[in-house]
Amino acid sequence: MTSSLDTDILLVGGGIMSATLGTLLHQLNPELRITLVELQAEVATESSDGWNNAGTGHAGYCELNYTPQDADGSVPIARALKINAAFEESLQFWAWLVEKGILREPASFINPTPHSSFVWGEKNVAFLRKRHQALRAHHLFADMEYSQDPAVLQQWMPLVMAGRDPSIPVAATRVAYGSDVDFGSLTRQLVQHLQGRPGFKLLTRHAVTGLKQQGSWQVKAVDLSQGKPVEIRAGFVFLGAGGATLPLLQKSAIQEARGYGGFPVSGQWLVCHNPDVIHQHHAKVYGKAPLGAPPMSVPHLDTRIINGKPALLFGPFAGFTTRFLKRGSLLDLVNSVKRSNLKSMLGAGRHHMDLTRYLIGEVFQSHQQRMAALRNFYPLANESEWSLVSAGQRVQIIKQCEHQGGKLEFGTEIVSSADGSLAALLGASPGASTSVPAMLEVLQRCFSPQLQSAAWQERMREMLPSYGQSLIEDAELLRAVRYHTLSRLKLT
């Protein structure tokens, strides 16, 4: 027998995006009936899980791929500014949630971890110096430090400097109030709070099998624990299911989804098992990506706090896969090819063969080869103290392109229906770090009339003090907001 339920808001996927949107909507209108559907037995088991993502509070401080050097030698910083301002919005919301007791102690999900970029060789040192000069001239990056002094770098990153050839020039930048974020813990806390509110339902072990718009959205699902069909009628649907989002978006048949495809990329970490080594490193040290590597593969020696315990990771090592989820099917990629996106998929595949070859090469790397990559960052690394652990899946966006048929894009994108009744988040990187501004975009697209009301405007400014203003343009606002969030989240 089919069970049925009615809901105002249906969130598909129990990750950080759905948890953030559900929390925002509940704070804006506590009367809304909100239902969250998750395939697994618990929320935050895929890309939001601590072991499945970089955990970096992506603020553009250390990620060199956000500021690639132009042919003329200049270093454009516009993308880094945008990402930094976006992360500041996330920090503001989290700080407010801590103040209200919705999130527990900040250390339960976010911890101060300096963000550093590290390079070696004359050419790379010159690039990092230019990058620092360009960024530090802007108020968002005014606190960024730079040094070529090995003694200073020894203090910032002792593991990185120990045993290094002193004849090779090195340089590093550092922002002391960078952060490590356990998005799994953050997601679970947000969902736990929603579970205590009237009108919220969490349906785990439920698989969405179809959705069709007939006035409201008619969503078909299966309760996997009982093998029973479920029908859900929803006024608004958000697809935030990570790699499963694209197939669900295709099932929706909205016009705006035409032409979109996905390119799955897997990830792996080298994880240290020696507590003495782990406690000697306290930073996220990012380097330059190898030639041909996708941006989510920028190598870094990474301090993490996962489920309250310190960890030390190096990677990620990307790889080629046909799965869209870590626990997905090998047929995911093939099944995603439709008549509406065939041209896009073929065009992107034809023009990105170098990336495919790179990813396949990464898959067949030996442990010794991965250790050699690690020793660029930790010269004295002992092979016996590190092992390989699988990370999460990323499905990069493929879009229609007039000149190439299709193009591969690295980033995130909101796709929404013309009537605002459905929205989906595609892509990855910077991903979870910008969950708040990403979900604000969903509100702007799909709840525009309500968002313009005096009540919602007032509530938004309470939750995000910089709402409606530009942190990129307003230095005084940035200083005030940053002082408050860093203090409230105990990042300084």
From Swiss-Prot:
EC number(s) given by UniProt: 1.1.5.4
Q: Which reaction does it catalyse?
A: (S)-malate + a quinone = a quinol + oxaloacetate
Regions that span the bilayer: none
Note the PANTHER family from the entry: L-2-HYDROXYGLUTARATE DEHYDROGENASE, MITOCHONDRIAL (PTHR43104:SF2)
Kindly give the Pfam families that the UniProt entry links to this protein: Mqo
Named in its record, the pathway it takes part in is:
Carbohydrate metabolism; tricarboxylic acid cycle; oxaloacetate from (S)-malate (quinone route): step 1/1
Q: Which family does it belong to?
A: Belongs to the MQO family.
Entry cofactors: FAD
| HAMAP family from the UniProt entry | MQO (MF_00212)
> Kind of enzyme, top EC level?
oxidoreductase
Task: Give UniProt keywords alphabetically.
Answer: FAD, Flavoprotein, Oxidoreductase, Tricarboxylic acid cycle
Which GO molecular function terms does the record list? Answer: 2-hydroxyglutarate dehydrogenase activity; L-malate dehydrogenase (quinone) activity
The species is Methylobacillus flagellatus (strain ATCC 51484 / DSM 6875 / VKM B-1610 / KT)
BP GO annotations: tricarboxylic acid cycle
What is the name of the protein in this document? Probable malate:quinone oxidoreductase
